[in-house]
């Protein structure tokens, strides 16, 4: 078993970061996630948003890893459960693979919460527990997978910034469009009065 942890601070408020987290895929930084299906989404009586999603991923595994695990297939599936608490301002996301579970398990947990000293920033705490079962060189493979997770976490943070930029651009476009819509009738009314 290998445990990997990380902490990152986003220079954006919690509301922005959690909105981006829900819209993170697809993105050009991590093209291995090829599909996201929402299986269930509901708000509980306390106002928390619960989501259960299925992520389809396509991994380019090195041939040595394919031969060690005895699989040519590289499409894998991950189930993801998240809970967004708008009152406490926390988002907890847990994911686990549902493919190749007889050989490997990757359990990941992400927590997003406002920075305690700066409400315009968000802290992401990330942890992954990797367990390779029943193959020789399991500790080597666990280390290799931890390295891949670390690299993908970096890509994930880049993707979050990309989504946030995209969301901000959409907001600016909508705002400009709304201003134009408001000004047009006002301009027409002013023109009609002359």
From Swiss-Prot:
The modification Phosphoserine is found at residues 46, 51. One of its GO terms (cellular component) is mitochondrial intermembrane space. Keywords: Phosphoprotein. PROSITE patterns: PRELI_MSF1. Residues 1-172 form the PRELI/MSF1 domain. Belongs to the slowmo family. This is PRELI domain containing protein 3B. It comes from Macaca fascicularis. The gene is PRELID3B.
């Amino acid at each position: 078993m290998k445990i990997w942890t990380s902490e990152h601070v986003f220079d954006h408020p919690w509301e922005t970061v959690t909105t981006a987290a829900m819209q993170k895929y697809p993105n050009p930084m991590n093209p291995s996630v090829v599909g996201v299906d929402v299986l269930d989404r509901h708000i509980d009586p306390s106002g928390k948003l619960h989501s259960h999603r299925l992520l389809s991923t396509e991994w380019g595994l090195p041939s040595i890893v394919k031969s060690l695990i005895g699989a040519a297939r590289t499409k894998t599936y991950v189930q993801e459960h998240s809970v967004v608490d708008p009152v406490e301002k926390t988002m907890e996301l847990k994911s686990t693979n549902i493919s190749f579970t007889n050989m490997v398990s990757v359990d990941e947990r992400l927590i997003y919460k406002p920075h305690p000293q700066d409400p315009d920033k968000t802290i992401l705490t990330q942890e992954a527990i990797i367990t390779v079962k029943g193959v020789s060189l399991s500790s080597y493979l666990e280390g290799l997978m931890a390295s891949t997770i670390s690299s993908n976490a970096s890509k994930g943070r880049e993707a979050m910034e990309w989504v946030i930029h995209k969301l901000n651009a959409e907001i600016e476009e909508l705002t400009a469009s709304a201003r134009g819509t408001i000004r047009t009738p006002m301009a027409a009314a002013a023109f009609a009065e002359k």
